[in-house]
Curated annotation (Swiss-Prot):
Protein name, UniProt field: Suppressor of HU sensitivity involved in recombination protein 1
Superkingdom: Eukaryota
S-S bonds: none
Compartment(s): Nucleus
Organism of this sequence: Saccharomyces cerevisiae (strain ATCC 204508 / S288c)
Keyword rRNA-binding: no
Known function: Plays a role in a RAD51/RAD54-dependent homologous recombination repair (HRR) pathway to repair MMS-induced lesions during S-phase.
Protein keywords: DNA damage, DNA recombination, DNA repair, Nucleus
Length: 150
């Protein structure tokens, strides 16, 4: 399933209007992903069919733009440390693999491993888009942490 399809599915899902905190967190990483979301590429694919769905999507979906992998790690660490912060049922991470593909080396691998561990330790359901190639290092790290944590 693609990012747009999954977000559309979450927007169309049954929202309880008495819920006070956001239900979905979308984390957008890197300039390319940010431009896609901000310049309307995403809006063309994700639409709401009802007024209630539109209101719910505005109130229940939070979007965070981050420029570096280390900022994602800091943000995830803060999310876990906040006991009374917003609780999300779903976290969609968009652009992580593209952002990490620009740099190689042990530092980047270590940081990616830390980020994946933090993501998969969240009580929320975390999904990564687009999915990494199955034989790539990020995909193997993702399978490793998924096996260890879940």
């Amino acid at each position: 399933m693609q990012f747009e399809e999954r977000l559309q599915q979450l927007v169309e899902s049954d929202w309880s209007l008495d819920q006070s905190s956001p239900n979905v967190l979308v984390i957008v990483l890197g300039d390319t992903a940010r431009k896609y979301v901000e310049l309307g590429g995403l809006k063309e694919h994700v639409t709401t069919n009802t007024v209630a769905g539109h209101v719910a999507s505005r109130e229940r979906v939070s979007v965070v733009f981050l420029g570096r992998v280390k900022y994602l790690y800091m943000y995830l660490t803060r999310m876990q440390a906040q006991a009374n912060g917003p609780q999300y049922s779903n976290v969609l991470v968009y652009g992580l693999w593209d952002l990490t593909a620009t740099q190689d080396g042990p530092q980047q691998l270590r940081l990616l491993s830390l980020v994946l561990r933090q993501c998969l330790s969240l009580p929320s359901k975390v999904e990564f888009y687009p999915e990494p190639p199955s034989s790539s290092v990020p995909a193997r790290l993702l399978r490793f942490w998924d096996h260890i944590i879940r």
